[in-house]
Every structure is written in structure tokens, then in C-alpha cells.
Amino acid sequence: MFLLHEYDIFWAFLLISSVIPILAFLISGVLAPTREGPEKLSSYESGIEPIGDAWVQFRIRYYMFALVFVVFDVETVFLYPWAMSFDVLGVSVFLEALIFVLILIVGSVYAWRKGALEWS
């Protein structure tokens, strides 16, 4: 028989971590002042009134840098726990991590050759 009482701490943590943000939003909605005026409805940018049109188009180059950053950030997230338990896991996990790193190296070489890492 499956014992559910072993998961009591998990369910309590899940309930508490769900209730706290909901209560924070509800309390801030009740206690926050709701006065709207021209100052609240105006745009604000770094302490000065914005000049010009608000629709600014970014070059695709910025998105490529962000995408490459996310790929290497995810790589770090996956490799850190592996590195911390490297001595316990064994050779098969080492080979899997090596394949993972090789795939990322191939991807970074591809991005480099396509010019995604060139700033100018």
C-alpha cells in the first residue's frame, strides 16, 4: 500500500508556498490607495518625460545574444549539480555529461560561424 503520510511535509510546504503569494496580492490590493491622477497615468522614464515614440525596434542581434546567453545559462544549471556529485555518479554519467558538453560546443561553433556572436 502506498503511504501518503510520508508526503505530509511536501503538501504542507506546497500549501504554504501557494498561500503566501496569494495573500500578498490580496492584502496589497486591499491596502493600496486607488487614487488615479494625471501623474499616475503619464509615462515615466528615468525621472524625465519620455521624448518621441515609445515603439522602438531592437535589432535582431540583441535577441541572438540573449538566446546564446540562455543556452549557456542552462548549461551551467545542468552542469553544476553534476560537478558537485561527480565522484559518486560513475563513468556512464561522465560520458553523458561529455556528450552534453560536446553538443553545446557544436552549437556554439554553429552560432559563431553564423555570426551570432559578432557585435558590430
Swiss-Prot record:
It comes from the Eukaryota. It is a multi-pass membrane protein. InterPro entries: NAD(P)H_OxRDtase_bac/plastid, NADH_UbQ/plastoQ_OxRdtase_su3, NDAH_ubi_oxred_su3_sf. HAMAP family: NDH1_NuoA. It comes from Acorus calamus var. americanus (American sweet flag). The lineage of its organism: Eukaryota, Viridiplantae, Streptophyta, Embryophyta, Tracheophyta. Its EC number is 7.1.1.-. NDH is composed of at least 16 different subunits, 5 of which are encoded in the nucleus. Belongs to the complex I subunit 3 family. It catalyses: a plastoquinone + NADH + (n+1) H(+)(in) = a plastoquinol + NAD(+) + n H(+)(out); a plastoquinone + NADPH + (n+1) H(+)(in) = a plastoquinol + NADP(+) + n H(+)(out). Keywords: Chloroplast, Membrane, NAD, NADP, Plastid, Plastoquinone, Quinone, Thylakoid, Translocase, Transmembrane, Transmembrane helix, Transport. This is NAD(P)H-quinone oxidoreductase subunit 3, chloroplastic. It is found in: Plastid, Chloroplast thylakoid membrane. NDH shuttles electrons from NAD(P)H:plastoquinone, via FMN and iron-sulfur (Fe-S) centers, to quinones in the photosynthetic chain and possibly in a chloroplast respiratory chain. The immediate electron acceptor for the enzyme in this species is believed to be plastoquinone. Couples the redox reaction to proton translocation, and thus conserves the redox energy in a proton gradient. Pfam families: Oxidored_q4 (PF00507). GO terms for cellular component: chloroplast thylakoid membrane; NADH dehydrogenase complex.
